[in-house]
């Protein structure tokens, strides 16, 4: 059956074959940066917990001005640790929002330390955090991967 427009002509879409969906893990949602923009920093990716977005050995590009939590977005978060000279530990996380079943206006944030899609059977998380507390702990949003120009 040929699709037709309202004028009775064959639809342009009928000339194009349907393309089946094919998962392509090598494609990413993050931009590749050959140079580091002002107001950004890099952070080494220690493992494949956030694959396919980030891979072990790469450097995540972190926007230091953007630290408001957002559902499903990757961030660099800081935790206090007095055993370390600087007093802080840094880690990559994906923020997850949960709403209270009793009061949907009440929300809390959790920092997941891996993506379920990355193959981890169990996802460790920290929280709950209020929006304000999460914003204080988040160093910045991961906006890309640093690939130095050669």
Model-based region annotation:
Residues 31-35:
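Short boundary motifs at domain starts and secondary-structure transition points
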Residues 1-30, 146-150:
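Extended boundary segments
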Residues 36-150:
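Acidic/glycine-rich C-terminal interaction modules and beta/coil loop segments
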């Amino acid at each position: 059956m040929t699709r037709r427009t309202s004028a009775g002509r064959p639809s342009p879409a009928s000339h194009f074959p349907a393309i089946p969906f094919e998962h392509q893990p090598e494609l990413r949602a993050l931009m590749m940066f050959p140079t580091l923009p002002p107001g950004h920093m890099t952070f080494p990716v220690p493992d494949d917990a956030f694959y396919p977005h980030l891979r072990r050995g790469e450097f995540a590009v972190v926007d230091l001005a953007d630290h408001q939590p957002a559902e499903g977005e990757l961030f660099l978060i800081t935790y206090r640790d007095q055993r370390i000279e600087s007093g802080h530990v840094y880690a990559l996380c994906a923020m997850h929002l949960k709403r209270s079943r009793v009061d949907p206006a009440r929300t809390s944030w959790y920092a997941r330390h891996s993506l379920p899609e990355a193959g981890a059977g169990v996802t460790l998380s920290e929280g709950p955090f209020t929006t304000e507390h999460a914003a204080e702990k988040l160093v910045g949003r991961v906006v890309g991967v640093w690939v130095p120009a050669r």
